[in-house]
């Protein structure tokens, strides 16, 4: 039997150390990774997958402790001994984090940061260091590496920053690369490029890879073996082909089944709810003492669209295509040129009150409910905050509406006195939806509402949204980079690129018959 490169035995992870009130986050799991293997660790948010990976190199937060044994080839080490873990970090085990903009230092160039990773473990003359860094940037296929060497993280796109993170992780030629959700925040075309890059680097660097994700689909053709995690336990493991053919656990079966087996709501009217004409958004370029003006950035360029009553309009496009600027403009949260009109009876109100009334009818659900929900407010206060601000309902009426909104998203009454950190990602998104629908809006803007959720929870949230649309006659502006998901829920779709709508039509037409080259590329990238 081959000796594993890395073994984790009886790994348990606790919140509040090992005290009496400690909460067990991960329970007695075992993981083996062999030389040259691509192993995927799959689970929803809060399952313990990222904590398990961080424990291998001693990067757990101070309030969280790990117990268990690790084995690197034939060397045993204690997961509680941080000094022994330091010798692996960076040199033997490289780590790629989910959000490179947070992980990279904004004050230093990428060349300097990669160079520091190298000199931490090796003595290299400065004359040779730059050449080594540029060679790494070439290996990760970063365009124009000589020029990028002197760039700062904010000057790079999300995909470029992730390539820099990969270069840093590879800088000391580790034997194992741990990639923690490295493609979650990326659009489909860049996601595919990063996955292809990892696949090629595995061969050229003779790497083992531990790939952590909530998306089982993306590792189907990459991983040799799978570990499926749920609520801190490994519930299924095996060769990828075997798990996909004959999953044994109900949760795994739910992850593997086609994304959504539900029927979108029928359109019963052609009446327009909202129209946007000649819509443009420009952001001012940087100013300085020595330069009074610079070129403004055009985020939206003369966009025309309309949304019907009860319709879901899907918006797809890569990062930087203008999707979020479109949402913010429709919410009237940023300055714009053009005309946005909500085709509803308007009461006679002052200008300030008209805007308040407009925003009551147009609500938004954000991508990350953990960031958009205040950690200091109870769920009762979060859901009721918006409707209380309008001061048109009594205390009893507000309470009644809070309970109704909660029941509509299938959450129990005892939820109200708890706080966001006590809930899973899917539950937090239900709370965010309840906060939006309590306002009784006509249009709900859904900005990547399921991108951070695993397939099983994603299906539940999409089914909930479709049920709410049928019950409340809601219109949706559904923004996502997931073409398959958008096509499932949408009645019509628009494709955005460089601030413009470059293609539009029914999902069937865009996915099968579009003649637009950009749309074709998005479709091809979304099929792994």
Where are these regions (language model features)?
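Conserved ABC ATPase signature
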Residues: 151-156, 160, 419-423, 427
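ABC ATPase "signature
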Residues: 234-238, 246, 504-505, 513
């Amino acid at each position: 039997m081959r000796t594993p490169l890395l073994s984790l035995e009886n790994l348990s992870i606790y919140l509040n150390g090992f005290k009496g009130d400690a909460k067990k986050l991960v329970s007695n799991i075992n993981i083996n990774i062999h030389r040259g293997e691509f192993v995927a660790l799959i689970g929803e948010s809060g399952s313990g997958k990222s904590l398990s990976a961080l424990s291998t190199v001693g990067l757990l937060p101070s309030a969280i402790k790990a117990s268990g044994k690790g084995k690197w080839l034939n060397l045993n080490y204690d997961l509680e001994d941080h000094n022994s873990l330091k010798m692996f970090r960076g040199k033997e085990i490289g780590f790629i984090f989910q959000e490179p903009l947070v992980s990279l230092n904004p004050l230093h160039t990428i060349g300097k940061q990669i160079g520091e990773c190298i000199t931490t473990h090796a003595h290299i003359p400065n004359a040779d260091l730059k050449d080594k860094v540029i060679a790494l940037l070439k290996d990760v296929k970063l365009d124009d590496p000589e020029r990028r060497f002197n760039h700062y993280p904010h000057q790079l796109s999300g995909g470029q920053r992730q390539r820099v993170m990969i270069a840093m992780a590879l800088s000391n030629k580790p034997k194992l690369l741990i990639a923690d959700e490295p493609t979650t925040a990326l659009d489909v075309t860049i996601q595919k490029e990063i996955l292809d890059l990892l696949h090629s680097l595995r061969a050229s660097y003779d790497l083992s890879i531990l790939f952590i994700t909530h998306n089982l689909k993306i590792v189907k053709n990459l991983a040799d073996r799978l570990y499926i995690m749920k609520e801190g336990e490994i519930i299924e493991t095996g060769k990828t082909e075997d798990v996909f053919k004959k999953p044994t656990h109900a949760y795994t079966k739910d992850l593997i089944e086609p994304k959504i087996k539900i029927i979108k709501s029928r359109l019963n009217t052609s009446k327009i709810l909202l129209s946007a004409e000649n819509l443009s958004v420009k952001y001012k370029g940087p100013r300085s003492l020595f330069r009074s003006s610079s070129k403004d950035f055009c985020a939206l360029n003369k966009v025309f669209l309309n949304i019907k009553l009860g319709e879901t309009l899907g918006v797809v496009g890569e990062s930087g295509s203008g999707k979020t600027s479109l949402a913010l403009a429709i919410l009237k949260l940023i300055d714009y040129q053009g005309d946005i009109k909500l085709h509803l009876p308007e009461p006679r109100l002052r200008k300030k009150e008209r805007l308040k009334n407009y925003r009551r009818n147009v609500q938004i659900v954000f991508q990350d409910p953990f960031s958009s929900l205040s950690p200091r407010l109870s769920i009762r206060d979060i859901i009721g905050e918006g409707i209380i601000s309008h001061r048109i309902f009594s205390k009893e009426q507000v309470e009644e509406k809070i309970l109704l909104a909660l029941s509509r998203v299938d959450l129990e009454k005892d939820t109200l006195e708890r706080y966001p950190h006590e809930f899973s990602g899917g539950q937090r998104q239900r709370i965010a939806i309840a906060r939006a629908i309590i306002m009784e809006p006509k249009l709900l803007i859904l900005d990547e509402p399921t991108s951070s959720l695993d397939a099983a929870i994603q299906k539940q949230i999409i089914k909930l949204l479709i049920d709410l649309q049928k019950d409340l006659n809601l219109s949706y502006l559904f923004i996502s980079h997931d073409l398959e998901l958008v096509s499932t829920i949408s009645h019509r779709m628009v494709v955005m690129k460089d601030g413009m709508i470059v293609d539009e039509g029914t999902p069937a037409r865009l996915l099968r018959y579009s003649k637009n080259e950009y749309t074709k590329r998005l479709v091809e990238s979304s099929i792994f």
